Amino acid sequence: MPTVAHTSEADRELFARELDSFVPDVICDAHMHLWAKTQLPPTGWEAFRQVEEDVIDLAAYRRRMAELLPGRRVAGGLILPGAVAATGEQLLSQNELVARQVAADDGWRGAMLVSPEMDPEYVRGEVRRLGLSGLKCYHVRSGKAITWDADIPDYLPEAQVKVAHEERLWITLHMVKARAVADPSNQHWIRTYCETYPDMQLILAHAARGFNPYHAIQGLAALRGLPNLWCEMSAVTDVGACEAIIELLGHDHLLYGTDFPVSHLRGRCVAVGDSFVWLYDDTLNWDTISFQQVRPVFVGLESLRVLKQAAWHQRLSDSQVEDIFCNNLSRLATP
């Protein structure tokens, strides 16, 4: 299984060689997770259990980020609950952990983990009680036998989007379906929600789930002209999706994110045909696949290389790069 790792010499060398001159001094993280081991359900991703700490709070996150981005200051961002499949008391505990971290640091905003069966008025009351400013939905909560093919309303019902509009919340959406943002159903619901509820800010996770960049290249044109639509680029390691966002939606609607702790796994995601595959440090024997030495580095570094190449291809200025790393999120985040 992949493990949440500490920095290696290969990680440090790559950052110094390729990224130190690109990453601004101050960053904001639009997609990161906090959790406690006791909040993980029995079927939770084992990588979350492999960390040394029992509770991954902002202090633990900052220690890890100092390894990924040496010399940089993380000024704030959006906190998402980490145990996205949690239920019952574990789910409540997740949301309360996020709320405590938000209350202790003005630079951060937090999301409430929601399930489609939650009454919208319960969602409204909990967001207010906990001092949160966003919602986090996830397809595993859809109730569908095959959650990877769920329609957006199956795990993000319109009644909850209406609450987000009325409370001026942001929503982080990790869409599914085989072709992601190129799927007509996903396009329909994203546009419908954004146009019907303009005071809701919708963030499409992972470059509109552009793990296969051709889905983003082919699908994002259908979502032009939505001022409350954003994309964050966490954990995307193939070139193309970030360029499509900048080209079709504008650099001012692209957000930097890490998807911590995924940022601290070693490997990358690779487009294959009309899909994609994740290759981690334990997926295959890296010592035997090439005539030369191959050593995977942090996913978070691979995604930064992709963002750097997108900025270069789109001829972004330094100030536009700084927008992606922090300023755009400052414009989006609501108090």
Stretches found by the model and what they are:
Residues 2-10, 89-179, 229, 245:
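Active-site gating/metal-coordination segments in enzymes
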